[in-house]
Regions:
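RNase H-like, metal-dependent nuclease domains and their acidic two-metal-ion catalytic environment used
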Residues: 1-119, 129, 144, 148, ...
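C-terminal accessory subdomain/extension
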Residues: 122-123
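Surface-exposed intrinsically disordered loops and tails
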Residues: 126-138, 173
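Domain-level recognition of nuclease-like catalytic cores that cleave nucleotide substrates
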Residues: 135-138, 142, 152
Length: 173
């Protein structure tokens, strides 16, 4: 909690239609996006963050958040932002309508850097690009275990200053 209290937010450089850009794309930098998909009926938010993963500490450079965008329209937004950020790697949550979004990115928009997960039974899911020869799926299937491990890793990265961000919505969540 003390780390969260010390975080300071800054206004984004650009803000338009749910997309807040804190740092513009830089050539030769690598980016990754984590995507969470909602139904677009005003309750939960469809959202993603763009993270510069070139060096440590990693830095959140952009964020999208909208609770009205329909799952059929969301892939186009993801695609455009990912392309602008040097063909960012995308990890999409595929529970419920997330699977539809990942499928549109892969098969309709033919996005090359969509990450996949290999299902390893009790060993869980392994993130990769689908070349493991194992049973793979587009994106990550969210479960209590995945959420718990992800939350603990996120907490550690924030506390150890390995992930930096200055977005108001992220800090308040």
């Amino acid at each position: 909690p003390s780390k969260l209290k010390s975080l300071v937010f800054e206004r984004p450089r650009n803000s338009n239609a749910g997309l807040d850009i804190h740092v513009a794309p830089e050539t030769e930098h690598d980016y990754a996006m984590a995507v969470d998909v909602a139904r677009g009926v005003g309750n939960d938010y469809s959202a993603f963050v763009v993270v510069d993963i070139t060096t440590f500490p990693h830095k959140v450079v952009a964020k999208y958040r909208d609770n009205t965008i329909k799952p059929m329209l969301f892939p186009s937004v993801i695609y455009e932002v990912a392309r602008n950020y040097n063909q960012a790697f995308i990890l999409c949550e595929v529970n419920d309508v997330g699977d539809q979004v990942a499928s549109i990115l892969q098969y309709d928009l033919e996005y090359q850097n969509l990450l996949m997960c290999s299902m390893r039974g009790r060993a869980g899911q392994i993130v990769g690009q689908g070349f493991s020869g194992q049973k793979t799926q587009l994106g990550v299937k969210m479960s209590k275990t995945v959420k718990k491990v992800g939350s603990l890793n996120l907490k550690t990265m924030i506390e150890e200053d390995k992930l930096l961000f200055c977005d108001y919505d992220i800090i308040s969540e």
